[in-house]
């Protein structure tokens, strides 16, 4: 069991063209508390088959896992089966891994995008909203990308994508990697969100 008392809140705020999610945590324990948090949003576009969506990530590293999905080591992404820096069609690959070493923009945000395919955009122009950008602030140093082909819907199982901003990788309570340690009464806050692409 987790022998600490950490008071957490999650605030969801609709903003123009998107959603901002703010996580806060306060350690109410008498001792320092280990802490990590992440979101688990799934995305599916009504305009086109999820198989045709294009996933793009500029992450530099991936956590390689064993048969139980426990990370064993960190590896460079470039040139591997996980490399999505040039965009990958969702229906062409399966992944359930944590990406890290995320490049940041001038505002300190990392970005992962899911977009309609060039073929769809060409055939249906003009298209107002072309995809979405999942952004995360510097407190979120990891993002898990999961592409199950078995997501249940009223019309059967379909391909979908989960893009999951996280402060640490899986199993961090055991490894300590990127784990937050909150002092007594320390307040921590971090944000991630989703913005429409045009």
Where are these regions (language model features)?
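Surface-exposed, gly/pro-biased binding rims or lids
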Residues: 1, 50, 58-71, 164-176, ...
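Extended, loop-rich substrate-binding clefts of extracytoplasmic carbohydrate-active enzymes
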Residues: 1-16
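Hydrophobic core residues within well-ordered beta-strands of beta-rich domains
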Residues: 8, 19-21, 188
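Beta-strand-rich interaction surfaces with strong enrichment in secreted/lumenal proteins
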Residues: 9-11, 101, 177-182
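Asparagine-centered strand-capping/turn motif at beta-strand->loop junctions
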Residues: 23-29, 154, 196
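Short, hydrophobic/aromatic beta-strand segments
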Residues: 31-37
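Active-site/ligand-binding surface loops and adjacent short beta/alpha elements
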Residues: 32, 42-137
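Active-site pocket scaffolds in enzymes
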Residues: 124-198
């Amino acid at each position: 069991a987790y022998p600490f008392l950490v008071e957490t809140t999650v605030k969801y705020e609709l903003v123009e063209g998107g959603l901002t999610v703010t996580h806060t945590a306060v350690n109410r324990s008498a001792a320092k508390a280990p802490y990590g948090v992440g979101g688990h949003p799934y995305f599916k576009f009504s305009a086109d088959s999820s198989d045709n969506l294009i996933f793009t990530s500029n992450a530099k590293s991936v956590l390689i896992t064993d048969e139980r999905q426990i990370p064993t080591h960190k590896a460079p992404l470039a040139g591997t089966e996980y490399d999505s820096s040039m965009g990958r069609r969702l229906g062409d690959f399966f992944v359930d891994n944590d990406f890290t070493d995320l490049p940041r923009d001038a505002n300190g945000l990392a970005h992962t995008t899911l977009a309609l395919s060039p073929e769809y955009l060409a055939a249906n122009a003009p298209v107002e909203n072309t995809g979405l950008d999942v952004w995360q602030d510097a407190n979120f140093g990891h993002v898990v990308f999961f592409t199950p082909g078995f997501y249940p819907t009223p019309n059967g199982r379909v391909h979908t994508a989960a893009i999951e901003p996280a402060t640490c990788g899986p199993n961090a309570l055991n490894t300590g990697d990127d784990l937050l340690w909150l002092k007594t009464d320390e307040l921590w806050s971090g944000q991630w969100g989703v913005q429409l692409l045009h």
